Every structure is written in structure tokens, then in C-alpha cells.
Amino acid sequence: MFNYSGLNEECGVFGIWNHPEAAQLTYMGLHSLQHRGQEGAGIVVSDQNELKGERGLGLLTEAIKDDQMERLKGYQHAIGHVRYATSGNKGIENIQPFLYHFYDMSVGICHNGNLINAKSLRQNLEKQGAIFHSSSDTEVIMHLIRRSKAPTFEEALKESLRKVKGGFTFAILTKDALYGAVDPNAIRPLVVGKMKDGTYILASETCAIDVLGAEFVQDIHAGEYVVINDKGITVKSYTHHTTTAISAMEYIYFARPDSTIAGKNVHAVRKASGKKLAQESPVNADMVIGVPNSSLSAASGYAEEIGLPYEMGLVKNQYVARTFIQPTQELREQGVRVKLSAVKDIVDGKNIILVDDSIVRGTTIRRIVKMLKDSGANKVHVRIASPEFMFPSFYGIDVSTTAELISASKSPEEIKDYIGADSLAYLSVDGLIESIGLDYDAPYSGLCVESFTGDYPAGLYDYEANYKAHLSHRQKQYISKNKHFFDSEGNLNV
């Protein structure tokens, strides 16, 4: 999606165990995950004696410079992180991995997602005397681990993971092991890879494994954690109260098209969603164009299904930072003009089908429609390769209030008029589920579609009161007419 006024991804995590150039490979892995966050990056390394780290603000190349990388050489194990702030402010103190030095051990930790009970946990911990050095929810898990009475670090980790709620993955490093963990719904992805020399890798996406020439080993599934050390790799469960609900937005927008999630290639899923969208909402036109970059696969599928030319009517400046993930509305809107331009010779006098992957606030797609018409387009029919984004997300996407969502208060017809399109149609929820093609024995075939349905598989917890207080009339109507599988604590409704 190129909706600069829209969604923001959470983060990307990476880990590697037992390689003489651990920091350098981590840097490469993080580079392939840069699309998941641009506000900051960090790397923590370890050997059998110590842990040390470097971090900074900005893109990876800005955050960790050559002199910092020099200081990380010579260590065999590492974790790394690229950040977009979904909780906590945007200062250096919130850049991960966090590194803790205790009297008996040192620990590095980084996190992708959002802990929806972090506020209440933090309040309880502070009442017990805990001191926090950041506003990030990631720090909560470390306090829980250290306050555990469990006899080993692994047992303390398991106990702590059972206390936190939300959509998350963790990568944790000690001098003895590399740990990874996934929430009880597997909302956020985590995969394991293995290099030819036996080195194990953890990553948010398979693209970070592929870039190092490693082989995919397995997904870490709902409620599982992995331990990687000199003895090898072990995958265990920390809870059996699991219901798979993989974030549909990973497929729709966040993941790279060359990544594979739960056995489904992201590009193939997006193309299938475009085909399904064409079946559900065809329209007469001269051509199909996609909004660069993540909508291009869906646009090609739409064009192929409907039998129209697929043209490059919009050009993206590849050398500007991914402004969509910029933290302020003003920067996102300025980014539209800097990053995107219409190809006048292609669109002039034509009836266009414009495919995008979602509409969140609506301001960016409105600018794009105007840009195309200013360049001579006769008609612009907007087709969205996902359902209406009607409900906030609390699991690691930075759209956590109803006020941010145009579909929460406006009908498709009203949105069509607002954005200046000649027609507007969305992919149905059933069409999305079919396009992705998961077959888990779970609601929505194992997808988390909370932003389209208001059905929250991990519950609401700290967000519940505010969420319910601000439900719009349109949201309430949708909820009353559609079955919900989960209650406010993420339990399956019987």
C-alpha cells in the first residue's frame, strides 16, 4: 500500500547464533527488514563472556554507522531490531534491542508487536518498586522475567510470556542462548532458518533468511518459543491456550512480496486477492494501474482476471524514504508529492482502474485520484484489495483509534465522493480469506481480521474501555449484524 496517511508497521526482529561475523550478518538481515520500521535500529552481540550493543535513530545506515559496526566485530551471536513506534515515544531510549546488565547475567531483548496489557502490568510493577528507563512496552517483559521466582531463565521467560497479552514476537539473547517467542495467536510472524555451516537464524520474515543464502527451517507457531544454543535448536510451547490468527495485514501490506508466511507467498496472495476483487467488482475501463509498491501484485491480478492492460501509470521515487511509515500526518502527506507522480502520456484521456491495498484515513488516495485526473485521466475507478478498514488495530499497527478510520463513519458511497473517484469497491472478508488460502481449524481459517470485523482474537484488555466508548454508529451496526468468535479477553465464544 502507498497510503502515506494510513497504516504504520510495528518492527522487525532478527537473531543469529554461532557465526564469526554475527553482527555483519545481522546488519544484512535487518536491511532486508527495513520496510518494517524506519525510526531506529540496533544490534546487540554476545560471546561466552559479555553482551554489548549499538543503536541509533533513523534508517539502518543512519542508525548504525561503520565505526559502530567495528565495535561489534568478533562476537558469535547477535540480535537486531528495526523500529516503528506503536507504543512509547520516538527517542533513542526506546530504540531496541534493550540491553540489561544484572549482577548474575546480561540480557538483550527486542520485540515486534504490541502488548495490550502493558499499561496495567507496568502500573503493578511500579507499585512493587520497578523502575522503567523507557516508555516502550518491551521493557515490561524484562521486569516480569527478573521478578519471577522460577529456577532458570527459560522457566522465567515461559512464566512471563503467559502474563503478557497481544500480538508479539520476541528475540532475546544471553551469553548462553538465543530465544524467540510468538504470541498465542501467532498474529506476528517469526521464522527459523539455517545456513549451510549450521548457523541458525531467527527473523520476522523469510526474506531476511533468503538474503543470507540460508534455508527455511520452520515457522514458530502460536504459543511457541524456540531456544537456540550450542546444542542445537529446540521448539517448545509455553501455553496450550492457542488459536491461530495470523495478521491478514502481513499479507495485504506489511511483508515483502518475496516473503512466505505460513506457507503462503505474499506476492501470490496479493495477486490472488486482485483476481478475486476483479471477480467481485468488475468495471469497464481502458487499463489497470496499481499504487506502488505493495499494490502492484494485486493490480496485476486484477488486470489479468478482467483482461485489461496492466500499465505503469504511477511512478514512485525509489530514493525517498518510505514516507508511509513516517510518524506524523504532515510528513506522510508531504511524502505523497515527493514520492509519487502520474505518467501523463499513459493516463491522459483514459478510464482507469486504480488498485490500492487499503484505505485508512482516505487523504492519500484522494490526492492520488486528483493527481491522475489532473494528468488527464477521464475516469478513475478505485478498487481496494482488502475489506473496509473499519476498526482500530491494537496488535502492532499504529491505527489504534476510531477517529483515524474513514470507514468507521462513512459508507463506501460517501468515501467515493470524498476521494473524488468515479466508483469504489472493496474486497469482501470472505474473498480475502479465500485469496490468502489458510486452512487452520480456527475462525477466519486462521487469520486475524480484526480491523475489518472488530473481532479481536487476543482480546482488548487495557484498550477495552476507550474502544467501546468511542464506537461509531456504523461500527455498532456492523458488530450487531455479524458474528464475533472472540470475547474481550480473546477467549472463543461458545
UniProtKB/Swiss-Prot annotation:
InterPro entries, A to Z: GATase_2_dom, Ntn_hydrolases_N, PRibTrfase_dom, PRTase-like, PurF, PurF_N
Binding site for Mg(2+): S294, D356, D357
Active-site residues, record numbering mapped to chain: C11
Cofactor details (free text): Binds 1 Mg(2+) ion per subunit.
Maturation-removed propeptide residues: 1-10
Superkingdom of the source species: Bacteria
Protein name: Amidophosphoribosyltransferase
Organism, as annotated: Staphylococcus aureus (strain COL)
Encoding gene (name): purF
